[in-house]
Amino acid sequence: PENQKLYTYNDAYFWGKDFLISPILNKGQKEQSIYFPKNSDWVNFYTDEKISGGTTQTIATEEDKIPTFVRAGSIIPMAKPMQSTKEYDGNKLVLHYYFDEKVKETELKLYNDDGLQNEAYEKGQFEMMNFEAKTSRKTITFELENEVGANFSAKSKNIELIIHHVSKNPNSVKAGCKKLEYTYDSEKKTLKVNLVWDSSKESKVKIKL
């Protein structure tokens, strides 16, 4: 509200609260000038380059990609590629966490039902998963909780947690006292952790850097 110029700015828009999209409207356009809202840094969805909020940047465009940026510190749920929505399985999740040490806490609520019932929420045939990331100087803590409807049976979840912008190989990755297997890509600065979560219980993944 305090930036009056943004009322007439139409070169980018929010998709939800954590994606910034800047469509290319002219054929053969090689670059795009984009304003990145302040109070957050932003991450190029395709390259992982971090961009400071409150700045205008000239971004090179690619023919097969729409300029897309993610709010730093956010948790983004995704699924593996599929041919149709019939193949979607809410018990197999990919969670991208765009780690930013300036963002101390962030939260994602993710609704799920079997995709078959009408008015599943009203009938209590649903679950609402809650993922929360907390950061300190040398620790990332990822908490998993689940609110289950009265007539829904929660199942174990296979989760691939991908954490972006991790500057070094962690000292340890644990769920409770159990060590978790992980892979760290020093070039891309990404940490991948695979876990099976009994979603009828709370769980906590602690990463010591």
Named regions from a protein language model:
Residues 137-139, 179, 208-209:
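Solvent-exposed, well-ordered amphipathic alpha-helical segments
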Residues 1-139, 145-170:
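Catalytic core of carbohydrate-active enzymes
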Residues 164-168, 191-201, 209:
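C-terminal accessory domains/tails appended to large, multi-domain proteins
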Residues 142-148, 203-209:
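Short, hydrophobic/aromatic-enriched beta-strand segments in well-ordered soluble domains
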Residues 176-200:
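Extracellular/luminal ectodomains and secreted, surface-exposed scaffolds of diverse proteins
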Residues 69-71, 131, 182, 206-209:
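Short beta-strand element of the conserved SAM-dependent methyltransferase core
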